[in-house]
């Protein structure tokens, strides 16, 4: 297994002026502080990262007014060999990643504070793929996701070989690979903005993927050529890793899966 030091970046910010419904319901300032199974969302993510091999540092991208609530959570996971610090979240995902990576050469592991089902096996899988790539993103098949929970995910990317859901964990080999994050510069979901997809991946590639006439490996080769760096996919057999706490529905799903996992660990 590939094992090398890696900096973990946890995106925990939220849009300025927008009150997250889950945070409002829980009476907290930020979604990352919403409790699930008795602990804040981000606490579950930090636990997974702190339990993983060779995480050299954890950087949390978050607004200043959330830091006081994070102090005891950080204290529970920080060690002499694992510093955890906060850096101000920027206005978008890309700028937040760039700010969190400032002054560091990489490699980087990027995830989100609502990725509560993250585990060490997922981190190891991404690390393994990143040893052979500039950038890595993670996927689980629709069968794996629906097997984990029938209501866990409703959006899948259809390829000729299978349909996949995205998992919110990414690997970037070095600072040069941060240009991969520029794909998301405009923010939002690709599915809602075809023009954004075309600019990022090229029209011919989008058409091949849109109509499911190309396999995922073939698509990765074509997109790698388009972007001029090696892009690889980490395949997760655990479909639960494609389920984040996005809304009331997925909160309930994650709560059920977390409780089941914690019971099994006893």
How would you describe each model-predicted region?
Residues 24-43:
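Short catalytic helix/loop segments, enriched in acidic residues and glycine
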Residues 118-224, 236-240:
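Conserved core of the sugar-phosphate nucleotidyltransferase
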Residues 65-71:
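Short, charged/polar "capping" segments at the starts of alpha-helices
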Residues 72-109, 117-118:
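Short phosphate-binding loop-to-helix
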Residues 48-55:
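Short, acidic, metal-binding catalytic loop of nucleotide-sugar glycosyltransferases
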Residues 247:
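Short, conserved phosphate/pyrophosphate- and ester-handling motifs at nucleotide-, phospho-/glycolipid
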Residues 1-27:
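N-terminal nucleotide-binding beta1-loop-alpha1 segment
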Residues 57-63:
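Short internal beta-strands
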């Amino acid at each position: 297994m590939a094992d090398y030091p890696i900096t973990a970046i946890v995106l925990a910010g939220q849009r300025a002026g927008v009150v997250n419904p889950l945070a409002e319901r829980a009476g907290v300032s930020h979604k990352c502080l919403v409790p699930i199974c008795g602990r804040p969302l981000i606490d579950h993510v930090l636990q997974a990262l702190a339990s993983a091999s060779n995480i050299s540092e954890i950087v949390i991208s978050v607004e200043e007014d959330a830091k006081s609530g994070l102090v005891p959570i950080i204290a529970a996971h920080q060690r002499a060999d694992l510093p955890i610090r906060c850096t101000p979240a920027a206005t978008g995902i890309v700028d937040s990643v760039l700010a969190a990576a400032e002054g560091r050469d990489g490699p980087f592991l990027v995830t989100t504070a609502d990725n509560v089902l993250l585990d060490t096996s997922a981190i190891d899988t991404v690390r393994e793929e990143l040893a052979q790539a500039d950038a890595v993103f993670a996927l689980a098949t629709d069968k794996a996701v629906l097997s984990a929970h029938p209501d866990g995910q409703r959006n899948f990317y259809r390829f000729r070989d299978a349909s996949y859901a995205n998992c919110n964990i990414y690997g970037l080999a070095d600072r040069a690979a941060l240009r991969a994050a520029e794909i998301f510069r405009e923010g939002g979901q690709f599915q809602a903005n075809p023009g954004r997809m075309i600019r990022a991946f090229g029209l011919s590639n989008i058409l091949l993927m849109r109509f499911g006439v190309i396999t995922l490996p073939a698509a990765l080769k074509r997109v790698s050529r388009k972007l001029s760096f090696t892009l690889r996919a980490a395949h997760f057999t655990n479909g639960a890793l494609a389920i984040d706490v996005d809304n009331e529905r997925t909160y309930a799903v994650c709560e059920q899966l977390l409780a089941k996992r914690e019971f099994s660990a006893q």
